[in-house]
């Protein structure tokens, strides 16, 4: 839900173990996102391939452990998501510092449960970090945010049509109407 609500153009997602990196990567891929993992098991050639995909904008989400992510330089990175918070302040600062580099703005999000929250608050106090606490977006929040985003995108495309595109669109209006008439066909549109 966070990824759907935030809609980051790119994100580095941190996990504490390789097993969790594998899990998060597979879940993202099954949801249709461009995601790959960055672990110490990758060969140097594979690492270079993954980084090149990120830099060219062909890979949206890179899921990594702290150890593997040392030295990665991704200046265009918009988001860091800490799927699991680190135990140490230095690791938190290293992770969060991967976004908003070279004067650019960035967003760092840390997911915590009630127990992890107290540890994160200790890190924030020790390092004078101002945290902004927010609940996870609800399904209704995500639906509202995504629908606003899609409507704005479609309206912009509608305003930018030329004569040929208007003519072509007219041919598909009956199909669009028929797809919105039944639940099964509406599901096709939601895909």
Regions found by a protein language model. Name each.
Residues 104-191:
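Arginine-glycine-biased low-complexity disordered regions
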Residues 18, 43, 69, 138-139:
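Positions that flank functional sites
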Residues 17, 47-48, 143:
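Short Asp/Glu-rich motifs
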Residues 2, 6-26, 31, 35-38:
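Conserved strand-helix element at the start of the C-terminal RecA-like helicase core
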Residues 15, 65-66, 135:
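Short secondary-structure boundary segments
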Residues 26-129:
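Conserved RecA-like helicase motor core of SF1/SF2 enzymes
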Residues 1-3, 50-51:
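Conserved alpha-helical scaffold flanking the Walker A/P-loop in AAA+ ATPase domains
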């Amino acid at each position: 839900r966070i990824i759907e609500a935030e809609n980051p153009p790119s994100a580095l997602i941190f996990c504490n173990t390789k097993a969790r990196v594998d899990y998060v990567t597979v879940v993202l891929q099954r949801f249709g996102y461009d995601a790959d993992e960055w672990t110490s098991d990758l060969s140097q050639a594979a690492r270079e391939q993954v980084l090149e995909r990120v830099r060219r904008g062909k890979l949206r989400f890179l899921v990594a452990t702290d150890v593997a992510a040392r030295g990665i330089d991704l200046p265009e990175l918009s988001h860091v998501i800490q799927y699991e918070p680190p135990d140490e302040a230095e690791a938190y600062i290293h992770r969060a510092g991967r976004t908003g580099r070279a004067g650019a703005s960035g967003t760092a999000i840390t997911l915590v449960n009630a127990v992890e929250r107290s540890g994160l608050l200790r890190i924030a106090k020790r390092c004078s970090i101002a945290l902004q606490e927010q609940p996870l977006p609800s399904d209704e929040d995500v639906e509202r945010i995504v629908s606003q985003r899609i409507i704005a995108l479609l309206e912009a495309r509608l305003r930018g049509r030329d004569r040929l595109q208007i003519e072509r669109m007219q041919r598909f209006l009956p199909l669009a109407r028929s797809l919105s008439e039944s639940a099964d066909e509406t599901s096709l549109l939601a895909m």
